[in-house]
Amino acid sequence: TLFPYTTLFRSPASARSAVPEAGYFRGFDLEPVRANLISAALIYSNKRFTDVVLGANRTGHVWAANITTNQVDGYVNWVGQGRDASSQPLLSGKFQRLEIPDTRTTEFDGLLNTPPASLPALDIEAEHFVLAGKQLGRLQLKASNRADGSGWEISSLVLDHPSARFDGTGLWTRASAAAQQTNLTFTLVLHDAGQLLAVLGQPDTMREGSGKLSGRLGWRGAPVEIDIPTLEGELALALGPGQFLRTEPGIAKLVGVLSLQSIPRRLTLDFSDVFAAGFAFDTVVGQARVANGTLTTDNLLMNGVQAQVLIAGNADLLAETQALQVQVLPTINAGLASIAYAAVANPAIGIGTLIAQLLLQDPLRKLFRYEFEIEGSWAEPKVTQTRPNDAQNPADEIYGPH
């Protein structure tokens, strides 16, 4: 077991002070300048490491170390305060592997309960970053305190995985323990959304799907954990060809709701052909707003080979419930897909305007249009058809009564 013996040593700054402290000669320095350690098991600050190989050297205020354990393999630099009057401590490192086990993610709570000004600047790179057992790819993180002391700023956060690349910037402010705020702006470039969901613990939810999810989010609290009841922001999604797979809604939750598997067979259009194996889409596009943990959209469009699905409504991210209005229009004229895509790309256009444009371009679709409401929990959504497709006069359906 290794204890923090560094409290026994005199810091270089105090050792070189003009007036030596009692018991020490002027310039006397007991802080080590070199440390080497090899251990099969090491416990430090209640953390257990195995297969430890450590080599460290100090020059003035700078510690440089090579370290290899079962969780870490890389090079670390620690630059303490004192190198100049305005500087802040800097922790930098380059790792071949950096792993934070699930049992240690809670340690960040204690770390981030301190004022942002007490945190060091960070410059971290890791070729293989593992968080709570999830292989997240290459990590790059740069963060520091603002010069005016107004917060801890994340100038760059990059996670680069074969399935996706996340780029973000953020700011954490803390006036008091009860008055913290985190703001994040990000872009998630998706190479394979299905693979990414599998990495995040939701396998067999989606097949393929490439595109981009971008937006800004803010919440009360520290960056380490999103506080859903205070979550607010805006999101934009543009996703390319893929397929929602047929899974139990309780497993895939909201993604399962969007796959529309729970919509039953209808008399005129047999939805089992469209949704039974999971909805295959060419594009999924739309914008959403988030306020107090509730996500709201007016223009989410899923464009498939057999049908176009337009969704408006809201989803409560904390209660895991939704109140959605769904319009299903069979694809009779495939050329209308570009019209729908262009319309939904404009956030000012709502679902009603978009449907009107589609029906004007192809009135025949009005015969086969279906409307549904999806309510209740994500695990057990309740689907109600709100517009029966049983027109007595097809001409009236297309052109209106004469």
Walk through the language-model features, giving the residues of each:
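Conserved strand-loop elements at the edges of beta-sheets that form or border functional pockets
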Residues: R58
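Gram-negative outer-membrane assembly/targeting C-terminal domains
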Residues: E373-H402
